[in-house]
């Protein structure tokens, strides 16, 4: 992830300490999951698109880039699209990777830890 991406992320998010958890940043970006439902009607779940369009665009483009160039993110993308329980479509998987990047950025910026790709891929179930 380049300097321009990090600077754009920080300029759109602002002070990271005002967020209690990464889900709040996910909501700010418009990646919150909403369901279109009414009474007995169960609609599909989708992202809300409410939030900062530029932040959402930067995260999506960065997710595409890291999937193409980073082995750990490529492995996560492959897992999301090929898992037997609830496999995601291509774009859904890219959005899931973007949300994972939000969680990684949040952890790095709040706790001051460094990026560790092996930690990130530990929760993948290998069949």
Predicted regions and their residues:
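Hydrophobic aliphatic residue packing
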Residues: 1, 13, 58, 95-97, ...
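Phosphate-backbone recognition surface of nucleic-acid-processing proteins
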Residues: 3, 7-90
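Low-complexity, acidic/Ser/Thr- and charged residue-rich accessory regions of DNA metabolism proteins
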Residues: 40-41, 77-127
């Amino acid at each position: 992830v380049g300097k321009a991406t990090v600077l754009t992320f920080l300029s759109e998010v602002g002070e990271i300490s005002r967020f209690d958890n990464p889900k709040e940043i996910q909501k700010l970006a418009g990646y919150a999951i909403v369901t279109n439902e009414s009474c007995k009607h169960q609609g599909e779940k989708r992202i809300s698109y409410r939030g900062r369009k530029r932040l959402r665009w930067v995260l999506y483009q960065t997710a595409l880039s890291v999937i193409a160039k980073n082995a750990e993110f490529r492995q996560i993308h492959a897992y999301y699209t090929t898992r037997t329980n609830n496999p995601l479509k291509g774009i859904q998987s890219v959005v899931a990777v973007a949300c994972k990047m939000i969680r990684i950025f949040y952890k790095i910026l709040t706790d001051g830890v460094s990026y560790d790709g092996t930690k990130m891929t530990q929760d993948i179930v290998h069949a």
